[in-house]
Amino acid sequence: MALLKPFPLQHSLRCMASRFLLHSHYHTHTLSFSSISLSRPSIVLNPRVINKLRRLSDAILIRNMVSLRAFMSSSTTTEAFQENTKSKGYGSEQIQVLEGLDPVRKRPGMYIGSTGPRGLHHLVYEILDNAVDEAQAGFATKIDVVLHADNSVSIADNGRGIPTELHPVTKKSSLETVLTVLHAGGKFGGSSSGYNVSGGLHGVGLSVVNALSQALEVTIWRDGKEYQQKYSRGKPITTLICHDLPVEMRDRQGTAIRFWPDKEVFTTEMQFDYNTIAGRIRELAFLNPELTIALKKEDIDPEKIQCNEYFYAGGLVEYVKWLNADKKPLHDVLGFRKEADGITIDMALQWCSDAYSDTMLGYANSIRTIDGGTHIDGVKAALTRILNNLGKKSKTIKEKDISLSGEHVREGLTCVISVKVPNPEFEGQTKTRLGNPEVRKVVDQSVQEYLTEYLELHPDVLDSILSKSLNALKAALAAKRARELVRQKSVLKSSSLPGKLADCSATNPEEAEIFIVEGDSAGGSAKQGRDRRFQAILPLRGKILNIERKDEAAMYKNEEIQNLILGLGLGVKGEDFKKEALRYHKIIILTDADVDGAHIRTLLLTFFFRYQRALFEEGCIYVGVPPLYKVERGKQVYYCYDDAELKKVQRSFPSNASYNIQRFKGLGEMMPAQLWETTMNPETRLLKQLVVEDAAEANVVFSSLMGSRVDIRKQLIQNSASMMNLEQLDI
């Protein structure tokens, strides 16, 4: 493992693979800029414009992996200056009426979440989900997705094809209606709906994509004819063209849409990530076992062309097997499918002996409900009740006053549940939580019936699950005692802080930030170079505990972990996270750009992810990017963040130029002023904000990389070794 220069984090998280996208963000007290993959020259110690620094260093940039997906994402935001002026008047002339698709272009974030990378990819998902709805309705079996070299995307299915007849209300073709009118679609339910079950509810998906595309082309195959029409920024620029298909093609049906995102809307990030889209496609293929989805990325360089086909006949059972590939299962994957009261339930689950947290994924009409909902609540309630009842019935749980909590029962559980609901109630356009109360009852009863019958017929499986749950209870009691001991030692609740923490004078956590640095040497430079008004420094003594392999009791006894919990104000694991309790809202990991530094970054990320995952969800975790090289030519000094920048600087010099190159092996080698100028100054530094995009895949990666299975870790490294630049080997 010591072969890779920035191995544990850079390559490990490269291995963690395309599951990781990192958000670059730097902040001043008046303006906030953020970027991803934007070009930036090396830092020169002269006055500079902040925008010149907007680029992501390859230090831990994760993208372009083949078989893995980004589980951390980046969003790009720029906060415009708001002039504080009083309105000159407020009358009827100030009341604006936005017509057609103007509301979408005026406030795109309301429809796609953001105008950064996440919103950009949301356009693809809107069209993709429409195609999947055709598959769920039983009319489509194949979807082709192509990421073209000109940064357009095309999605084609073999479903029924969007209707093209004249619509009785709009007096336009039905195709133009769904493309140009908000809340027009065939998925509103009822006898007149074109779909019994669908993920689209508001009739805005296709029209929103059209509104936010500088160009969109649609082709329909239906009733032996081919229809074509072109649009720009939500408006048709051609009429609907129709011609007959050749005799041999008259059975062809389906819809193909190709769109070019509007540069006026997506001004900061216009690059589609293959692996991010591949992850969503893989998910949809697991959820729809009769559907085949092909993904291709075109490129002018033949070696960079990527393509994969996703088909999983085993459905959710295969999904759980994939999620648990690096774990030690206690039993075979359990799975069932049932329909009750018009709701279809598809579920698979498995407990693993070497996992100490649960992974529960919920879907409603193939839409990932990242915030859970009534279907997840139903599963949790049923599991807790079933295992307590069967445990007491089998005398495995003997004490009358002991009951297993949901947390104990679910330790080591991987569960995926997908429900198909005719009239789902989602929270918001982004559909992050399912709200139908009737779903909880149906799911609860279905899980109760299936799991009770199965476990009574397989007492060995029941015994292994109960043994795991009872061990979780004992570990929780031991951890509770350890927490109390820690509290008594003034680690969690005392006002005293770790001795090595150099705190800042700011008392508002929103204004304060803390750098977690590697060792006293780097800590000394950082303490001298920082701005004491709002920057705190916490030096670590060597590598912290790998909590992936330890229980809570051992974690709380570790001094470095104690320092992190107290210094950052993380509270107690398992308790509700309160951002206002944090001492700093910006937690910056700042380590050396070598093997040890990358390993420490990975250990810290593992700790934060397992101990308080909400830190990622709240956008509190950052990685600082120090320069690798210092180039001096005369009075000019250049700082380069990777080998590519170094070569670029060298090429800019005359062939006979004389200059000196210094490679920084550690932060301790940098003078405090250098560290401030290049790495800590909010006006010139480069930070990467880490946000969990897919908790399930993040869980898989952390388990693979930091768990006890050497064979799985070795396989992960070998599978990704071919993607490593040989020049980055540290031999």
UniProtKB/Swiss-Prot annotation:
Residues reported in the UniProt entry to bind Mg(2+) 1: 518, 592
Record carries keyword DNA-binding: yes
A single Gene Ontology CC term: mitochondrion
InterPro entries, per the entry: DNA_gyrase_B_C (IPR002288), GyrB (IPR011557), HATPase_C_sf (IPR036890), Ribosomal_Su5_D2-typ_SF (IPR020568), Ribsml_uS5_D2-typ_fold_subgr (IPR014721), Topo_IIA (IPR001241), Topo_IIA-like_dom_sf (IPR013760), Topo_IIA_B (IPR000565)
Subcellular compartments: Plastid, Chloroplast; Mitochondrion
SUPFAM superfamilies: ATPase domain of HSP90 chaperone/DNA topoisomerase II/histidine kinase, Ribosomal protein S5 domain 2-like, Type II DNA topoisomerase
Family label: Belongs to the type II topoisomerase GyrB family.
Name this protein carries in UniProt: DNA gyrase subunit B, chloroplastic/mitochondrial
Protein species of origin: Nicotiana benthamiana
Gene this protein is translated from: GYRB
